[in-house]
Amino acid sequence: MSRIYYRGGMSPFETFSPGYILTHNVIGTNVGNFLYLNGVLRSLMIDDNTVIQANYYNTNYYKPEYVNENFDCFVIPLADAFRENFVNELTSFVKKLKIPCYVIGVGLKESYEPDFSQPKPQDEAVKKFVTAVLEKSNCIGVRGELTGKYLETLGFAEGRDFMVIGCPSMYMKGKRLHIQNPKLDVNSKVCFNSNVAASVPTRKFIKLKMKEFENHYFIGQVVNELRSIYLGAPYEYKIEYNFRNVTDKIYQDGRLRFFCNVPKWMEFLNDSDLTFGSRLHGNIAAVLAGTPALLVTKDS
């Protein structure tokens, strides 16, 4: 029997209400985290003898001593975790473990064309984390070449310390991936996504494109969007966002959606003709559902 302890907000077998998600933040602020987490777990759960347990984004959910005695490994799926506010407590937890630790799909949060010639605020924290993990495993999996280049500036080597593996969400369907080829017209069902990290022109462009398709939907992914949809609260952010209030037309027309689990999300996208926007996992979800997607890139 394989007993896997992993970093994540929920398991693929759990479903939480919108209210619970808002109060406990099991999505880690972004429901896109479900996607790569499900991809990792689907790859690991190869038989009925595999037991999985989430830490619900709480480093102290189980004490290190308990984890050492009751689990075979600690799996750490990550997104763009190498950033300025990188969490040091995860490093401390890993150092206390005696079981193997596996980092899968970690990425660097940076500008579109990052400058690696200058030190970054998170350098020391990232170096300590990667070193701690490598003491418990042979290698870590990173999302792309830019993350690899960043780790090289910290003294780590590709092939020895890390390997570029892409985003784990793309593993979810294995080789059985079929993308439909719809004929698009003004009546097509098109799903849009966007975020505040995208530039103002990008957000305006996405909003403009929505007007070209009457049967459009905007798919939210972050906690503030869920709070607006579920509670009617204004979207709280320091800069102007596309749909901040329930008085906006998209709310009034019932064209805004937020999905609290991956199956329902992909079911809705499978019934769509195209997904378009600046959210990586919002578009990957569409591809996994068999729907073509167009990603507007905003960073590395």
Residues covered by each model-derived region:
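Active-site anion-handling motifs in enzyme catalytic cores
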Residues: 1-300
